[in-house]
Curated annotation (Swiss-Prot):
Name of the protein this chain belongs to: Octanoyl-[GcvH]:protein N-octanoyltransferase
Entry annotation: catalytic residues: C152 (acyl-thioester intermediate)
Family the UniProt entry places it in: Belongs to the octanoyltransferase LipL family.
Biological source species: Oceanobacillus iheyensis (strain DSM 14371 / CIP 107618 / JCM 11309 / KCTC 3954 / HTE831)
Domain BPL/LPL catalytic: 48-253
Length: 279
């Protein structure tokens, strides 16, 4: 496995903060838009028309679904529950299962080249190490292993004391790699987990399925603020991202979407809309 600093260290990093932006190229800044943006940036990084990217994004109440979630036997009941609780639903184009987003959850996309020579595990490990470095002054107890009972469980769940606060997914476009992580920073993590648990209850109704959906236990989830005993905000964590990135690059630049990126974004946005219409 490659050293994580070798994977992330680049002379120049492009920094994009979409956390408070209301629209992107004329499209409302929703989670659907975010996945199209990351695909666009992965293409640019792959074609070397952009340096590697760190992008920050935050969305109001959204349940991001995986493709298996869209195949629940009673998905209409699950979707109705989501809407009744004032969440919108988006089916993502990367791996994983349902995740709850709101203003207390910071999403970070690390978009780098190397799709042909970096393994999936190399990239997951690099993100784990990056997050550990971000909070090294507060804790050395961030671990990566599957937290049974969490939503969107996986080998690279991030937890403190056995309670999960983050999950990682990954998507590859050409030679570009987008490693995405959600960080539960502040707010009611228990309520987020309850919504996901009830979504599965409504969508499955105890029916036997060939796919194993998680049996969500809100007690195994937590926010960073709660787990660290520090009143962290999303803004605080954004500053930590930049501070850590400064140690891994010679310069950080902010570049708006270029002409070709706008073209690619519109194409990828249409694909995301179509994906969500067909699910």
């Amino acid at each position: 496995m490659k050293n994580w600093k070798e994977i992330i260290h680049h002379q120049t990093f492009r920094y994009i903060d979409h956390s408070t932006q209301t629209d992107i190229e004329g499209k409302p800044n929703t989670a659907l838009t975010s996945f199209a943006v990351d695909d666009t940036l992965a293409i640019s990084v792959s074609e070397e028309t952009s340096p590697p990217v760190i992008r920050l994004w935050v969305h109001s109440k959204t349940i991001v679904l995986g493709i298996p979630d869209s195949r629940l036997p009673f998905i209409d009941s699950g979707m109705q529950f989501i809407e009744q609780n004032n969440y919108q639903a988006v089916v993502r184009n990367s791996g994983g299962l349902a995740v709850a987003l709101d203003e207390g959850v910071l999403n970070i996309s690390l978009i780098i080249p190397g799709g042909k020579n970096l393994s999936i595990y190399d990239c997951y490990e690099a993100m784990v190490r990056f997050i550990q470095a971000m909070f090294h002054d507060l804790t050395n107890d961030i671990k990566a292993y599957e937290i049974v009972g969490s939503y969107c469980p996986g080998d690279y769940d991030l937890s403190i004391g056995g309670r999960k606060f983050a999950g990682i997914s990954q998507r590859r476009v050409k030679n570009g790699i987008s490693v995405q992580i959600y960080l539960d920073v502040e707010g009611n993590s228990n309520q987020r987990a309850e919504v996901i648990r009830e979504f599965y209850n409504k969508g499955k109704k105890n029916m036997e399925t060939s796919f194993t959906y998680p049996d969500v236990d809100p007690k195994v989830m937590g926010s960073l603020s709660e787990l660290l005993g520090v009143a962290l905000t999303v803004d605080d964590v954004q500053k930590r991202v930049v501070h850590t990135l400064e140690k891994l690059s010679d310069e950080i630049v902010e570049i708006p979407f270029q002409e070709e990126e706008i073209v690619n974004f519109k194409k990828r946005y249409k694909q995301m809309v179509k994906r969500n219409e067909s699910n």
